[in-house]
Amino acid sequence: MCKKPYYITTPIYYPSTNLHIGNTYTTVAADAIARFKRLTGHEVMFLTGTDEHGQKIERIANEKGITPKEHVDEIVAGIKDLWKMMNISYDKFIRTTDDYHVKAVQEIFKKLYDQGDIYKDSYEGLYCTPCESFWTETQLVNGNCPDCGRPVEKAKEEAYFFKMSKYADRLIQYIEEHPDFIQPESRKNEMLNNFLRPGLQDLCVSRTSFTWGIPVSFDEKHVIYVWIDALSNYITALGYGQENQELYKKFWPADVHLIGKDILRFHTIYWPIMLMALGLELPKQVFGHGWLLVDGGKMSKSKGNVVDPVVLVNMFGADAVRYYLLREIPFGSDGLFNNEIFIKKVNTDLANDLGNLLSRTIAMVYKYFDGVIQAPTCKEAIDDELINLALSTPGKVEASIDALKIPEALESIWTLISRANKYIDETTPWILAKDEEKKERLGTVLYNLLETLRFVSVMISPFLTETSVKINDQLNTKVITWESLKEFNGTVAGDKVVKGDVIFPRIDVEEKLAELEALKPAPVKPANEELVKNPIKEEITIDDFDKIDLRVVKVLECEPVKKAKKLLKLKVDLGGEERQVISGIAQYYKPEELVGKYVVLVANLKPVKLRGELSQGMILAAAPSDDSELVLVNPGEMLTGSQVR
């Protein structure tokens, strides 16, 4: 049977330093989807890799006294070790220093130049080295890069430019005609309204101020800039521009580019326009997931809150980390990573729910039948609910994954696990065992539990890769295909189960929290000068209100919260750091009235979820006791991040 091809990619990561839990989140999510597609009969190409050129790499290498290639080789080795530790099943790992990629990128650049889409000019602007981005004065936030908040440098140099504006209208039309191209929906509106419709400037696509990059083949004092170099990896990895293009013909266009929302603009504007210019098909979908927030904000060395996935895996195991990232983080929205919540989730979902179901079932089969699986010959009506739920769950899981709703898929599986635990309490095998005449019924109950565990094991295999194998070993089952879940009879009567170790031992929460706290990196000086002068205080509760830290913020976006008449969702700029705030001011202000306003934020209030949305602070307002009106505190157009005293 011919398998349907499926092509999924992660971003290629920038190896300036070791990766953190946020990068791991993207790759684990892509791995889970890739594994699921293989399980359900697809021929999968799962691509990841590293974006290894640029001025920042060159500077870091010079500071270390080594070559840029030596530096990236060292970091890439660590990245591959991390992916091995996380059980990432990529099919290809591309490095932009690979010879085949270098040659293909040079050919792409020349083709675009020869057809008039790239031209030479000179450029003078403000450049952010960490982001490798040029900005105009009006785009800066407090004089700093609007993406990362770091200082920019003036740069003037001869450069090649790509005629982005030539394809802008065509791209707008394409996005409007292909509603699934950019997901989630809110990201699509952001790209259209904030970047495309206001008008695109031509894009600088070469540099002469550094040498660590792919040289322009016909003008070697220029190196090809990150956009054409890095973004082209998605097709060069398949053989585009090379003699053997079988993989390209089979897998392109990509089914999904899975990326963080911070690089969405590059993947939904620059990349599709490049493809249009090359006469190639666009990827079917670009999915921009949210950020992984820690301590109420983005991970940052300046805050000392960067989470090292290696530490977590060494302490708790890869499957525990994978489960938390895939189940607890709302895919497509920002999510909170918290050590305490993580450990408690492992204890409740993995140790209590799944682990206890397996250990209790195996123990009872051994206790009552010496480990031998009995045939289900004595069924009762109470069995039907469990069996029907087991048979319907694979379809729910598949629908969720097709819609890239990974937490929903796991929720469906855990609903089945919970039902199986309840089934034990309902059927009371320990009581059945006391009556010799009910041995046949006891054997049927235990068969149903073993078969349910087989269903669970198959369904969790893309997500909890090691745990699935451990369960299969104890069940002693070889029937682990997705097709086998169409019938509730894959467990073989007469086989013998195998006693094994507890798959998820319970964790001492306080002990492990103390260990993790001791391993936290020390904060380094933040880049934002306003926050250096007035650092944000520690998290507070309402009872500690006298410690409150008030900051000036600018409202960037505002929209109603679904099914909540009083709530608005605001995206605000806190001196280079973006936050989401849920505020009960909908009856007093329309969303469009707030965009561009400067308001005051309670900046160190502990993040909470309101109606399922993360709120990272509280907007300050004044109102009479009868709430007849409400007025936001207006700080004037002070610098964002300024402290209100």
Regions found by a protein language model. Give the residues of each.
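Short metal-coordination and nucleic-acid-contact micro-motifs, chiefly zinc-binding Cys/His arrays
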Residues: 124, 138-142
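Helix-rich, typically C-terminal accessory recognition domains appended to large enzymatic cores
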Residues: 120, 328, 333, 341-379, ...
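A broadly conserved sequence feature marking short terminus-proximal activation segments
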Residues: 71-127
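Structured secondary-structure scaffolds
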Residues: 1-48, 100-104, 130, 148, ...
